[in-house]
Amino acid sequence: MYRFHTKRVRAAAGQVWTANLHKIRRSLKNVYQKCTTHHSYSTSYPTRASYGCDGDTLSLNEDMNLPAMLQDIKTGQTELLNQMTNIVSSISNIQEKINHYQNQMEALEARINISEDRQTATTKDMLSMKEDINTLKKKVTELESQNSYSSIHCLEVLEGQRGKEFVQLLHKLLQTETPKGTATSPDTVISSAEPERVSSYPEPTGELKKKTTSPQNITLKKNNSLQNASVGCKKVRSNIYIYPDFSTWIKLTFVHGGNWRFFLSATKLEEFIQWLLSRSTILPEEPQIIPQRDYAFTGAIGRLATICLSLFHYVYCLFGSSKEEITRL
């Protein structure tokens, strides 16, 4: 825009300058022609009288033409000065407009830079959000795979022949290790046990009744005690509860003279069973007889331990996982 205005101003100044210069040249040309004509006339008629008369007329014409020529030059200069002042004022206006437009362009550039910075920040935020979403998706898929794997692994362990063998081995190991810390006299155990514990045991068969009533049970050998313990363990049942959670904890309850509860993860069930299998199963040659009061004391401790474990398990299930029982064996 300002370039167009400068071009127009330059064109107008050039036109004014050429017009004034043309006028000056024309006036000078007229004077020169008059002088040349007068000189030629004086040479063609060389008389004194005419020369004097012509000299007077020439001097008068020159006196008349010089002020007019000077006046024309002066007017041309004034016009040129006015036009130059107009040009300068228009140029100053154009410069002001240029400055205004430049300020507007700078403001627009600043806004564009701010918008670009915001756009880059938003793109970075979007990329970080996408990365977070991808990581969350990966974690969710990992948790789902772990949950499915743990449940499948638990079911594989608990179901089928392998699970049954593990449960039977656990029963045998617990039955063989309990005479070290519990009473072995069937009469004292049954008489001192509470109704709940008695109800948890199945009723013994005829062979077991004979073995329990006979006084020779106190001096049994290893083979007879192991056989009786395995037979008794086969009739004792265990309750296994699986609680649905991401970690899939398992509660194992083994009933043998009291409630023993274990809380372990489904993925570590096999490790726990291997640890139990790796333990030594050495039995004492003669079972120990524990009095009635000692067994009552140990029974109270066992009840207190089971109450504490049950409270802990209830709080854990209340705040950490669901209370539904998926599988019960």
Curated annotation (Swiss-Prot):
Residues 178-214 are annotated as: Disordered. InterPro entries: Ccdc54. Residues 86-149 form a coiled coil. Residues 178-191 have a biased composition (Polar residues). Keywords: Coiled coil, Phosphoprotein. The modification Phosphothreonine is found at T182. PANTHER family: COILED-COIL DOMAIN-CONTAINING PROTEIN 54 (PTHR37880:SF1). This is Coiled-coil domain-containing protein 54. It comes from Mus musculus. The gene is Ccdc54.
